[in-house]
Amino acid sequence: MLQANGNELYVERRGSGEPLLLIQGMTGHSLHWGEPLLAALERDFELVLYDHRGVGRSAASDQPFTIADLAADALAVLDGLGIDGAHVLGISMGGMVAQELALAAPERVRTLTLGATYCGGDGARFTDETVVNALAAAILSGDPERKIRTGWEFNVSPRFATAEGNLERFSQVADQYPITLGMVIAQVQAIMGHDTSERLAQISMPTLVVHGSADQILVASNGELVAGLIPGARLELLDGVGHLFFWEQPERVAQLVAEHAVAARA
């Protein structure tokens, strides 16, 4: 555990190589990366995993926060571990946190990989209302199985959602350390206040933007917008893949992140 801005955060390190800070999305904790992705990434990096305040194995928290506050937590993780600079991979809400981290402390971010994320502002598209309503109804139903199943169906492609064993493997992760309704609301409020659209031009480190073309949570035009606003950013669209693209194509994602780091050193 590590103290970060008055919050006690769960932190884990695994693998060897240059450090890669992984920043999870809304409701996600460090197990939500999935073992296939982590095993692939640790062939090239020392992975720095942590759980957001009030989530997973981190201590409970009842204070409101912004995405910038979560970025300050991420920076505190690097400080607490004595890491001067790291490659950064942020997914969904974690991609928003990574944007703020790159803007606040660019000297600490060697490369930036933003996955399935959103910058706010003109042109950005938040989650469709019908999807939000379906997810909210599942969360409020009090039925854990319905909540996991509904979230799964909206977060991955239909083909992957129905393939044998995939939901069961995800459920084994999602059943652990369930998030409170209060923290879900706090994260939604933080996301709704997120807007880096007019500041992304300040990002100067090598940036890769990855998005699934079949993302139902944050449609792919969001990735196109983010990549277009960051000077020199490269966009990688994964065809037919949903929001949790790193569950659907873990080896490909690990390859993209590793190649991005190698290219930055060239």
Model regions: which residues?
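Short beta-strand/loop motif that positions the catalytic acidic residue
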Residues: 203, 209-211
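Conserved alpha/beta-hydrolase catalytic His-Asp/Glu region
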Residues: 144-192, 198-199
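Catalytic active-site module of serine/aspartate enzymes centered on a nucleophile-bearing elbow/loop
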Residues: 233-266
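Active-site loop/oxyanion-hole signature of alpha/beta-hydrolase fold enzymes
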Residues: 48-49, 53-89, 255
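Conserved HGGG/HGGXW glycine-rich cap/lid loop of the alpha/beta-hydrolase fold
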Residues: 4-59
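Acidic catalytic loop of the alpha/beta-hydrolase fold
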Residues: 214-218
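Gly/Ala-rich beta-loop-alpha elbow adjacent to hydrolase catalytic centers
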Residues: 90, 94, 98
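Flexible "cap/lid" loop of the alpha/beta hydrolase fold
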Residues: 99, 103, 110-141
